[in-house]
Amino acid sequence: SVTSYGLSAVVPLKDVVPEWVRIGFSATTGAEYAAHEVLSWSFHSELGGTSS
C-alpha cells in the first residue's frame, strides 16, 4: 500500500522574500497557443541572515 500526502498553501512571496529577489517561469511549445499550469513548485534558500 502506498500512502501519499499533499499540502497546499497560498504564500504572498512579497511578504517573505527580499525585494531584490526575482522569480520567473518560462514554457513553450511548437504551437501558436498553449496553456501551461504550474502543478508543483519548490523554493529553497540558504541565504545567511541575522536572528532577532
From Swiss-Prot:
It holds the Pfam family Lectin_legB. It comes from the Eukaryota. PROSITE patterns: LECTIN_LEGUME_ALPHA (PS00308). InterPro entries: ConA-like_dom_sf, Lectin_LegA_CS, Legume_lectin_dom. Keywords: Lectin. GO terms for molecular function: carbohydrate binding. Tetramer of two alpha and two beta chains. Belongs to the leguminous lectin family. This is Mitogenic lectin alpha chain. It comes from Vicia sativa.
